[in-house]
Amino acid sequence: MRLFGMCESVKKKAAVIVVVSLMAFCCAGFAVAAEHGAEAAPKGWVATDTFRVMNFAVLAIALFLLLRKPVAGALNNRIAGIREELARLEAQKEEARKALEAYNERLKMLDKEAEKIIEDYKKQGEAAKARIMESAQASAAKLEEQARRNIDNEFESARQKLRLDIFEQAVARAEALVTEKITPDDQHRLVEEYLDKAVL
């Protein structure tokens, strides 16, 4: 509502100025009346006292009528502002509570997720350990097999070398025996037998 084309804040300021001015005027009137009354002895109720009371009543009624709507409007606006502020604060409180619940839920989920990640890492570690152990056992088995083959090869090589040495020694010994014990007649007879076998 506009009073003489004024907005609410200007109207409030004007009402405050009017109230302060009227109170100052009344106080000045009481001070002047008291000053004049100090010269004479109190006489009781005087005609000016009636006018003063009437003046005060008119002023109070005028102030009441003038300020009733602006003060009521200001108080209503203030009450509405406080209600809006309370509603806004309640909404913020509710949002904060929901956000807190969401954060708590996320923290619980993060705890569960962290436990799951740790469990996954443990499983991966156990699987890696099993793979490493299996690989190490396979490598050890291969190394053992290769060592066994190498030992067998070395034994076989040593056997063949030993056989060859024994054979060479036997041949040398047989040759020595043959050269010692063979006579020219035996030699001639052996050559004849060999030639007969070769021709056949």
Curated annotation (Swiss-Prot):
**Protein name, UniProt field:** ATP synthase subunit b 1
Q: Which InterPro entries match?
A: ATP_synth_b/b'su_bac/chlpt, ATP_synthase_B_chain
Q: Self-association or partners: how does it assemble?
A: F-type ATPases have 2 components, F(1) - the catalytic core - and F(0) - the membrane proton channel. F(1) has five subunits: alpha(3), beta(3), gamma(1), delta(1), epsilon(1). F(0) has three main subunits: a(1), b(2) and c(10-14). The alpha and beta chains form an alternating ring which encloses part of the gamma chain. F(1) is attached to F(0) by a central stalk formed by the gamma and epsilon chains, while a peripheral stalk is formed by the delta and b chains.
Residues crossing the lipid bilayer are 14-34
| Pfam families per UniProt | ATP-synt_B (PF00430)
The organism sits in which domain of life? Bacteria
Q: What does this protein do?
A: F(1)F(0) ATP synthase produces ATP from ADP in the presence of a proton or sodium gradient. F-type ATPases consist of two structural domains, F(1) containing the extramembraneous catalytic core and F(0) containing the membrane proton channel, linked together by a central stalk and a peripheral stalk. During catalysis, ATP synthesis in the catalytic domain of F(1) is coupled via a rotary mechanism of the central stalk subunits to proton translocation. Component of the F(0) channel, it forms part of the peripheral stalk, linking F(1) to F(0).
Q: How does it sit in the membrane?
A: Single-pass membrane protein
Arranged from A to Z, the UniProt key words for this protein are:
ATP synthesis, Cell inner membrane, Cell membrane, CF(0), Hydrogen ion transport, Ion transport, Membrane, Transmembrane, Transmembrane helix, Transport
Give the HAMAP family listed for this entry: ATP_synth_b_bprime
- UniProt entry tagged with the keyword Transmembrane: yes
Q: Which family does it belong to?
A: Belongs to the ATPase B chain family.
